[in-house]
């Protein structure tokens, strides 16, 4: 039996007691530190109990809670689309009407923020990409958005119920959580395989015919509703004739009959500037097949298929000792180790997604909505950055809390830890090399520019440093369609090269992105900042348990301020502090990436094209020359772009000016926590408490300055 019935009583009285999960915190506050510890430890299930089964159940229950919150959030997005948006007006004229789903109430003149977005609608322009996603899904009216919003709330309720049910009524036993083969099969075949198949089915039966009609200029009110396509095959055959043949071509393996709705064209739809939706339907069907096969690969009840333990233990090379022996035990008993790997993979994938959003814009009219393109790129870069740093955080927690050196001898993990000095010192050298050389190229250019010697600068018009390997990769992909798949008419992305340019309503959706000296320079800044981030995070993981400075670090835990009194120079060495510093460098990395993307696209891709074919880019193609100096970045990018926001007061853009101001206030607030020491605040607090005592209004809970760790946490959060 894999389920335990009624393991934990449902008690509202217990839940109402703050800190009920911890013996110490349940006693209540003596100082204000209590409230911070409450926040820090509420979800640190390791600190509640040592029982791995109970910890696993809590994590499992929390996942349902997380899903419920996501459903509520999604419901809100869809509800705004239904109640406060100009979706239907946008749908009928997406090139002139801007998307808006937020209206500011007219309290003391705030209606100035509601600009005219077109279609007779006043509101704040949104940049989330939901309109484009809804159009691609085949949503044609606001009632459908209402229904989806209600459906999402119902699902949120189900998720909350499931979270309670699987912790309090029928909780899985530890063996269920550790049955990795079954979990792999179900997640691969069910979640990814059937999930992709369901989406492919929706695309084929609902989205494709609706989008085909919309592309042809049919009014959204005239388009048949989704159920009409599903119930009436005649309407479908008008859009895609092969539907008349039913499933006969499928079972006779004559699959090419379906090539009217399952295509492999490449490039973009010239009407919408998005990927061909017939390509994406084909893609999801193919992905579904792959994952359905993958979901039958692992050995469970019938003695056939792969065993994860066998794969890991066989994974050893001539120079790697015991290889991955012992890793199976780690990954089935340490959820931190499991999470670290998943976060690293998902973080990398999210960053890849951010690049696909502009190189292969997946939804109709997304590529010509520049503000949304910028927002989606930024969003996915940031999320990816957080996930990668989170991977290092949980890897370090694993090292401190879950790693048992006695069971890991001479396997890959042990060997990496034993030669950590070589790894970190080499990585440090790489960072120094990249930092001095990449920055040095810019300093050289600034100096030559200041001295009036443009011929001695590194640029496309003087001393060229062309990214030849990147150009070779681009060229290979640009030439691929002719020699790879039979029906591929264009490259996977038109950014690779060639002469194709897609414009929608005179606005450029995509064009080849040529790389030159300016990109070569900033690329090495990317390499530098990313390597420094990795250096800090990896050092935190590899030295989480011990170092020459603090040999017994593992005993001090994941986060600690210093190695006790009398040991000066041992502050800020905990694994937590490495995550803290790693976050700052992750921010550094992403800032440069977003600057590069934003300027490059405005300079070389985005803009307008006249009927005569004359192209006008937003910043007039100034990236290649201006971005080769630090001064160019400051003057022609940062100031040139920020000045519009700073001067936006009194117009409907002032919301962005206020956000810009507010963001800088939040940032300055963070520095207050990072630049002043704990003792400063403790001294100040005690003086204020003295004054309260004089007036006999002193609180029972003794006020106390934030600990060093807490102060830095507040600081990094607001940075």
UniProtKB/Swiss-Prot annotation:
Where can this protein be found? Plastid, Chloroplast thylakoid membrane
Q: Which residues bind chlorophyll a?
A: 672, 680
Q: How does it sit in the membrane?
A: Multi-pass membrane protein
GO biological process: any one? Answer: photosynthesis
What InterPro entries does the database record attribute to this sequence?
PSI_PsaA, PSI_PsaA/B, PSI_PsaA/B_CS, PSI_PsaA/B_sf
Q: Name one GO cellular component term.
A: photosystem I
Main location group: plastid
Q: Which domain of life is it from?
A: Eukaryota
Name the catalysed reactions. reduced [plastocyanin] + hnu + oxidized [2Fe-2S]-[ferredoxin] = oxidized [plastocyanin] + reduced [2Fe-2S]-[ferredoxin]
Task: Please name the NCBIfam families in this protein's record.
Answer: psaA
- Quote the subunit structure annotation: The PsaA/B heterodimer binds the P700 chlorophyll special pair and subsequent electron acceptors. PSI consists of a core antenna complex that captures photons, and an electron transfer chain that converts photonic excitation into a charge separation. The eukaryotic PSI reaction center is composed of at least 11 subunits.
Official protein name in the record: Photosystem I P700 chlorophyll a apoprotein A1
């Amino acid at each position: 039996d894999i389920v335990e019935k009624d393991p934990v009583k449902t008690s509202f009285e217990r839940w109402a007691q703050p800190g009920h999960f911890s013996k110490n915190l349940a006693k209540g506050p003596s100082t204000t530190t209590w409230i911070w510890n409450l926040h820090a430890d509420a979800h640190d299930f390791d600190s509640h109990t040592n029982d791995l089964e109970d910890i696993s159940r809590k994590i499992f229950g929390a996942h349902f809670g997380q899903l419920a919150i996501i459903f509520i959030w999604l419901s809100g997005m869809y509800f705004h689309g239904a109640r406060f948006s100009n979706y239907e007006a946008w749908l009928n004229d997406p090139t002139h009407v801007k998307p808006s789903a937020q209206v500011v109430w007219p309290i003391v003149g705030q209606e100035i923020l509601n600009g005219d977005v077109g279609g007779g609608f006043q509101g704040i322009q949104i940049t989330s990409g939901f309109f484009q996603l809804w159009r691609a899904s085949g949503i044609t009216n606001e009632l459908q958005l209402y229904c989806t919003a209600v459906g999402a709330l119902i699902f949120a309720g189900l998720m909350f119920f499931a979270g309670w049910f699987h912790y309090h009524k029928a909780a899985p036993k530890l063996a269920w959580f550790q049955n990795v083969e079954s979990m792999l099969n179900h997640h691969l075949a069910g979640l990814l395989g059937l999930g992709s198949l369901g989406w492919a089915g929706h695309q084929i039966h609902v989205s494709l015919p609706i989008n085909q009609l919309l592309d042809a200029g049919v009014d959204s009110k005239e388009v048949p509703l989704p159920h009409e396509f599903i119930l009436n095959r005649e309407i479908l055959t008008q859009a895609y004739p092969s539907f008349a043949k039913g499933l006969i071509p499928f079972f006779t393996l004559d699959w090419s009959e379906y090539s009217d709705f399952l295509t492999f064209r490449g490039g973009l739809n010239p009407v919408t500037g998005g990927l061909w939706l017939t390509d994406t339907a084909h893609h999801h069907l193919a992905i579904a097949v792959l994952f359905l096969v993958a979901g039958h690969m692992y050995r469970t009840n019938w003695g056939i298929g792969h065993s994860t333990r066998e794969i890991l233990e066989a994974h050893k090379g001539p120079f790697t000792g015991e290889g991955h022996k012992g890793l199976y035990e780690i990954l089935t008993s340490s959820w931190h180790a499991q999470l670290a790997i998943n976060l690293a993979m998902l973080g990398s994938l999210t960053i890849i997604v951010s690049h696909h959003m502009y190189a292969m814009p997946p939804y109709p009219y997304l590529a010509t909505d520049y503000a949304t393109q910028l927002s989606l790129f930024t969003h996915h870069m940031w999320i990816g950055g957080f996930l990668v740093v989170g991977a290092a955080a949980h890897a370090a927690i694993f090292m401190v809390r879950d790693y048992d050196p006695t069971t890991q001898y001479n396997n890959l993990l042990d060997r990496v830890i034993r030669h950590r000095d070589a790894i970190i010192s080499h990585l440090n050298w790489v960072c120094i090399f990249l930092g001095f050389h990449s920055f040095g190229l810019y300093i050289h250019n600034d100096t030559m520019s200041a001295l009036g010697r443009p011929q001695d600068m590194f640029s496309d018009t003087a001393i060229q440093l062309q990214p030849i390997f990147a150009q070779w990769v681009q060229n290979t992909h640009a030439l691929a369609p002719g020699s790879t798949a039979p029906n591929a008419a264009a490259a996977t992305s038109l950014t690779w090269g060639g002469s194709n340019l897609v414009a929608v309503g005179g606005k450029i959706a995509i064009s080849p992105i040529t790389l030159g000296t300016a990109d070569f320079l900033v690329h090495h800044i990317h390499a530098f900042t990313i390597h420094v981030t990795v250096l800090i995070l990896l050092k935190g993981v590899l030295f989480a348990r011990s170092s020459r400075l603090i040999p017994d670090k593992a005993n001090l835990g994941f986060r600690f301020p210093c190695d006790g009194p009398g040991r000066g120079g041992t502050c800020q060495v905990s694994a937590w502090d490495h995550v803290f510093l790693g976050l700052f460098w992750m921010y550094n990395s992403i800032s440069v990436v977003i600057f590069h993307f934003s300027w490059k696209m405005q300079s070389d891709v985005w803009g307008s094209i006249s009927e005569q074919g004359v192209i006008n880019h937003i910043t007039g193609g100034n990236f290649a020359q201006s971005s080769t100096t630090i001064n160019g970045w400051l003057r022609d990018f940062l100031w040139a772009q920020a000045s519009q926001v700073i001067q936006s007061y009194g117009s409907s853009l002032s919301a962005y000016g206020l956000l810009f101001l507010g963001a800088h206030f939040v940032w300055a607030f963070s520095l207050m926590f990072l630049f002043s020491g704990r003792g400063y605040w403790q001294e100040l607090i005690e003086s204020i408490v003295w004054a309260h005592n004089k007036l006999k209004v002193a609180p029972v809970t003794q006020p106390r300055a934030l600990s060093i760790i807490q102060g830095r946490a507040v600081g990094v959060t607001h940075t």
